[in-house]
A protein has these predicted regions:
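Exported/periplasmic ABC-transporter solute-binding proteins
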Residues: 1-176
């Protein structure tokens, strides 16, 4: 939903419109998780950035960018503003909202340096496993074979099923999709 615009038409699925409210309440079922992937031994600054993402401020940024925040009652950010560099790598779907989170975090913690490397979910998970990055980004759940790391869902992304604006189709069933 974060990329939906007026150049295309989103169709209803099982009668439910593709809206953030409908994804959040479960009536629109075409959605995926936006996960960050970490492993044990995260640096203080990386832990603090994760805390920011999961805070009320971070969750509000997620919502302002068209995604569904995970924690409606998240606590305010109360970080210690540690110093250091964080490398975040992975999903090109998660990357745009991660750039916004980075920008907001750097405004409150000028001691941090964050590099975002955009690729795909598998590379994000693998890079985290191998210690190439501190935080991986994945627009899917972890596979059973992706071990030694932990996924934390930071947002839900509603996936709009779209057609050309001139197409008369207004509604599809889950089976049709």
């Amino acid at each position: 939903l974060g990329s939906l615009n007026d150049t295309v038409k989103a169709v209803k699925i099982d009668g439910a419109e593709a809206t953030t409210d409908n994804v959040a309440n479960g009536t629109y079922k075409v959605a995926r998780p936006f996960n960050i992937v970490t492993k044990d031994g995260l640096s203080d600054v990386a832990k603090d950035f994760v805390d920011y993402i999961m805070s009320a401020e971070g969750q509000d940024i997620i919502e302002q960018n068209g995604y569904i925040k995970i924690d409606q009652n998240a606590a305010a950010y109360a970080g210690s503003k540690p110093e250091g560099k964080i490398v975040v790598a992975g999903s090109s779907s998660v990357s745009p909202v991660m750039e916004k989170l980075k920008e907001a975090y750097l405004a409150v913690n000028t001691n941090a340096d964050i590099e975002i490397q955009t690729s795909d979910s598998t590379t994000g998970v693998t890079s985290t496993q191998e210690g190439i990055c501190d935080i991986g980004m994945a627009s899917r759940d972890l596979k059973d074979t992706e071990t030694g790391v932990t996924a934390t869902t930071i947002a839900q992304d509603g996936i709009a099923v779209i057609v050309n604006n001139e197409n008369p189709v207004e509604n599809l069933t889950s089976d049709q999709v």
